[in-house]
Amino acid sequence: MRLSEFHLHTTKEIPADAELVSHRLMLRAGMIRKLASGLYTWSPLGLRVLRKVEAIVRDEMNRAGAVEMLLPTIQPRELWEESERWEKFGSQLLKIKDRKQAEYCYSPTAEEAVTDYVRQELTSYKQLPVNLYQIQTKFRDEIRPRFGVMRAREFVMKDAYSFHLNDADLVREYENMRATYTRIFTRLGLEFRAVQADSGAIGGDASQEFHVIADSGEDVLAFSTGSDYAANIEAAIAATPGPRLTANETLQKVSTPTQKRCEDVAALLDIPLQRVVKSIAVMTDSGFFLALLRGDHTLNDIKLSKLPGLANFRLANEVEIARHLGSEPGFLGPVCPGMPIRIIADCEVAVMADFVVGANEVGFHLVGVNWGRDLPEPEVVADIRNVIEGDRAVDGGKICIARGIEVGHVFQLGRKYAEAMKATVLDEYGKAVTMTMGCYGIGVSRIVAAAIEQNHDVAGIIWPAPIAPWQVAVCVINPKKDPVITAAAEMLLAELQSADVDTVLDDRGLRPGVMFADMELIGIPHRIVVSERGLAAGTYEYRARRTAMVENLDKTTLLTRIKA
């Protein structure tokens, strides 16, 4: 490939609405161009990267035994009404009418279409299991498209659907797909974590998300240094605390005139924040509760809502707080002699001793508080907090916190769609059996942006080698000055290509600084400079994009380095 024959248009301009690094760099590198809100044109450069991601995904899906197909993106209303998602999916479902006023949607997922195909094609248990996948353009009518292709309305996705006679076989394929996804993201050269997740609008039972680790990620992840344990912060758990500490202090009321925050109380009293307990007033279907957390912890709404009777909890307002405690936020506490308060204590709080709480009196806190003596044992003890960096993990390791970008999701759907759409086969006894399903998605176009979020510097993109547009850029200095320089570059290009090294020759005749800046911006892993001075010395200048290391190497050493 020669850049003089390739459309490459880089720019230094950054649109004001480009918030993420990946969005800015993809625009600057000329990988994408905005057509309309949430709609992007992929340039030849961008498409090279997208196709490389697709190729790895396709190769591993085929290796795993899945079979590729292609489903229509425009799907009839009747199918989506069978699954009851025509209305339930909400405003993200783009609905259209043809000239006959028949209604369709531009599909964001393809459960209905693939189930319709399978119920027509499969009749016997002998045809199961089957795993069908496609790499196809999808559409979600996002209310606020942003972040470039990270959250575009139109996107490229690999979606796979497996069909099984029973749940045991579904679990087997689910594990097969989990292992396949691990191979895919490993081959893509990305740092990632697989985490337990919620199935969301698609539905189903067990599910797991795959996240690329990046500071700009929308999701907060917790993972252990001791094993492959990882979870979304909402679902992450820490090891159970040890036995309750021994009480040594007497109860005292202290003045905290303006200190409402736990941090301020700890600073005033010159004690660790971990000794302060925050009281969060909540209203439930059965009344008023105080949820108690350590001062350095935060409430996990999802964990709290899963406790019996708390599915519809909400934070109490100031009127309700005053009615039940006679106080105001910032000074609330569970010590209420003669006025029993229902308490939900986080597991960590339940084993504390000599702790500090609000006195239910404006301007005062209580110190030296202990269970059983100053207040009754909590009605409920449960894990209701978010884990934090450094917590002891259930496997004995330490909890680490990072942000992640979701790029893959696997589900055990069960029979949700098959039952709704009457997708059955005959079993060995001739009885009609409803098939059970799995669903496995990868955001192909999103991976491109996520890879950039994880791999970049001030100069531009640093592609993982497997998905770089080219592995090597051969840059020619003053190609018109001496035909020997051009001939040497052409020979090097031919040798690299014959060794199956994806190489581009920058023969545009630009100034070296401009040429080098372009190669750094578009993230080519290896740069080789062919110059008059180098040829005179029998060397080529080599620069590794990731390490920025520059060396002058002879051709034999250079080719060995590139092929390694």
Swiss-Prot record:
MF terms (GO), sorted A to Z: aminoacyl-tRNA deacylase activity; ATP binding; proline-tRNA ligase activity
List UniProt keywords, sorted A-Z: Aminoacyl-tRNA synthetase, ATP-binding, Cytoplasm, Ligase, Nucleotide-binding, Protein biosynthesis
S-S bonds: none
Biological process terms in GO annotation: prolyl-tRNA aminoacylation
Principal location class: cytoplasm
Description of how the protein assembles with itself and partners: Homodimer.
Summary of the function given for this chain in its UniProt record: Catalyzes the attachment of proline to tRNA(Pro) in a two-step reaction: proline is first activated by ATP to form Pro-AMP and then transferred to the acceptor end of tRNA(Pro). As ProRS can inadvertently accommodate and process non-cognate amino acids such as alanine and cysteine, to avoid such errors it has two additional distinct editing activities against alanine. One activity is designated as 'pretransfer' editing and involves the tRNA(Pro)-independent hydrolysis of activated Ala-AMP.
Tell me the organism: Xylella fastidiosa (strain Temecula1 / ATCC 700964)
According to its UniProt record, where is this protein located? Cytoplasm
Q: What is this protein called?
A: Proline--tRNA ligase
